[in-house]
Design a protein with these regions (language model features):
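Long, charged, low-complexity intrinsically disordered regions
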Residues: 1-82
């Protein structure tokens, strides 16, 4: 973990594998975690990015999400860093 950020590489995973991995990381995230960075890439299409936004956009532990300018990373914001 890097200063409150957990990172997960999702390359090669399907939506089911992605859900299992992200749910586990959300359970693991402690009080010191304020952001989960999910690296899904963009050359293989937008299926994982779209899934993450749909599945976790209204998750009770996720305040909001950010997509990187290139579309290859989604960050789940669990709490604002102050």
């Amino acid at each position: 973990m890097q200063s409150g950020i957990l990172t997960l590489d999702l390359h090669g995973k399907n939506t089911h594998q992605t859900k299992v991995a992200v749910d586990a990381l959300l359970r693991k995230a402690g009080n010191g975690t304020y952001r989960i960075r999910l690296i899904h890439g963009y050359h293989g299409g937008t299926a994982l990015r779209d899934f993450l936004q749909s599945e976790y956009g209204h998750h009770p532990n996720v305040k909001r999400f950010l997509t990187s300018p290139d579309g290859g990373t989604t960050e789940l914001i669990l709490r604002e860093y102050v």
